Curated annotation (Swiss-Prot):
<protein>
    <recommendedName>
        <fullName>Aspartate carbamoyltransferase catalytic subunit</fullName>
        <ecNumber>2.1.3.2</ecNumber>
    </recommendedName>
</protein>
<feature type="binding site">
    <location>
        <position position="136"/>
    </location>
    <ligand>
        <name>carbamoyl phosphate</name>
    </ligand>
</feature>
<feature type="binding site">
    <location>
        <position position="265"/>
    </location>
    <ligand>
        <name>carbamoyl phosphate</name>
    </ligand>
</feature>
<dbReference type="GO" id="GO:0016597">
    <property type="term" value="F:amino acid binding"/>
</dbReference>
<dbReference type="GO" id="GO:0006207">
    <property type="term" value="P:'de novo' pyrimidine nucleobase biosynthetic process"/>
</dbReference>
<comment type="subunit">
    <text>Heterododecamer (2C3:3R2) of six catalytic PyrB chains organized as two trimers (C3), and six regulatory PyrI chains organized as three dimers (R2).</text>
</comment>
<keyword id="KW-0665">Pyrimidine biosynthesis</keyword>
<dbReference type="InterPro" id="IPR036901">
    <property type="entry name" value="Asp/Orn_carbamoylTrfase_sf"/>
</dbReference>
<feature type="binding site">
    <location>
        <position position="58"/>
    </location>
    <ligand>
        <name>carbamoyl phosphate</name>
    </ligand>
</feature>
<feature type="binding site">
    <location>
        <position position="223"/>
    </location>
    <ligand>
        <name>L-aspartate</name>
    </ligand>
</feature>
<feature type="binding site">
    <location>
        <position position="86"/>
    </location>
    <ligand>
        <name>L-aspartate</name>
    </ligand>
</feature>
<feature type="binding site">
    <location>
        <position position="169"/>
    </location>
    <ligand>
        <name>L-aspartate</name>
    </ligand>
</feature>
<comment type="function">
    <text>Catalyzes the condensation of carbamoyl phosphate and aspartate to form carbamoyl aspartate and inorganic phosphate, the committed step in the de novo pyrimidine nucleotide biosynthesis pathway.</text>
</comment>
<keyword id="KW-0808">Transferase</keyword>
<dbReference type="InterPro" id="IPR006131">
    <property type="entry name" value="Asp_carbamoyltransf_Asp/Orn-bd"/>
</dbReference>
<dbReference type="InterPro" id="IPR006132">
    <property type="entry name" value="Asp/Orn_carbamoyltranf_P-bd"/>
</dbReference>
<dbReference type="GO" id="GO:0006520">
    <property type="term" value="P:amino acid metabolic process"/>
</dbReference>
Length: 313
């Protein structure tokens, strides 16, 4: 359990204390990653099934790595090699996999709400690895962990989220999590890529990039979600990059020296971020990847019923 939750589906559901429970445990899990032998017996005998209906590099590999470091058995499943191609429903697929008695189902799906639907029909814990444009809770948690690690705290800090906010499940999870930890959130991007009503979550909305990043402690750059966009919402990527992309000159002129830059990946280099910025000293993007393993270890440990404090060592 994570606090009162059997599942990890949306950070909208999580309290400040429940978010901190995960990222505090992730500190211990990250220590395991620094060891020469990266293996602990915490989840020995447990099974984690990864169901991915959408392409993924970081998230699927991260959950698989997290499970294996904790000594759980990990089964990776993709829709292209399953009976879904023969017309089997999502719920039937989940029920059949649950019959194999996994402890955790990790699911990524193009439809918002798919993980919650699965959770209503299975008895094991369900973790959302991203559902449509709804949420990506483990990414939101690893962003919280990374920011706290780099900034010391999120209390009183300002985070700018820039790009295609409307179609970003990462942005939604961050929006639900950051204010609970005391951070102020600024959203920036084309008006056509800004969802209505985000102000109710405590964010301020900007269309001017310089204004949005002025004085920010961290900037999270988002890619354009072409796969979720129907009619074009911007004139073109070149024009987008000129206005909302972050290059070395803008970073040097507009960001305060201590500001860090994050990106959930994959990066469209030369569009939202120039290579110089993505690979530069401000970038903590690869830290996010490593922290993602630690955070997902914490999630799996809490949901699968880890074997106690001694098993972490």
């Amino acid at each position: 359990m994570i606090g009162r939750h059997k599942h990890c589906i949306a950070l909208e559901d999580f309290s400040r204390e429940e978010i901190l429970e995960v990222i505090d445990l992730a500190v211990s899990m990250k220590e395991v990653l620094q060891r020469p032998i990266k293996k602990v017996p915490s989840l020995r005998g447990k099974m984690v099934v990864n169901l991915f209906f959408e392409a993924s590099t970081r998230t699927r590999s991260s959950f698989e790595t997290a499970a294996k470091i904790l000594s759980a058995d990990a089964l990776n499943w993709t829709s292209s090699s399953s009976s879904v191609t023969k017309g089997e429903t999502l719920v039937d697929t989940a029920k059949n996999l649950e019959a194999m008695r996994p402890d955790v189902l990790v699911i990524r799906h193009s439809a918002g709400g798919a993980p919650r639907l699965v959770a209503e029909h299975v008895g094991c814990s369900v973790v959302s690895a991203g559902d449509g444009a709804h949420e990506h809770p483990s990414q939101g948690l690893l962003d919280c962990f990374t920011l706290r690690e780099k900034l010391g705290t999120l209390e009183g800090k300002t985070v700018a989220i820039v790009g295609d906010v409307s179609h970003s499940r990462v942005a939604r999870s961050d929006l639900h999590a950051f204010p609970k930890l005391g951070a102020k959130v600024r959203l920036c991007g084309p008006p056509t890529m800004m969802p209505a009503g985000v102000e109710r979550l405590g964010a301020t909305v900007h269309t001017d990039l310089r204004e949005a990043v002025d004085g920010a402690d961290a900037v999270i750059m988002l890619r354009i979600q072409h796969e979720r966009i129907g009619d074009p919402l911007i004139p073109g990527t070149r024009e987008y990059s000129k206005v909302w992309g972050l290059n070395a000159k803008k970073a040097a002129d507009w960001l305060k020296p201590s500001c860090v830059i994050l990106h959930p990946g994959p990066i469209n280099r030369g569009v939202e971020l120039s290579p110089e910025v993505a690979d530069g000293p401000r970038s903590v993007i690869l830290d996010q990847v490593q922290n993602g393993v630690a955070v997902r270890m914490a999630i799996l440990y809490l949901l699968a019923g880890g074997a106690g404090e001694e098993a972490r060592a």
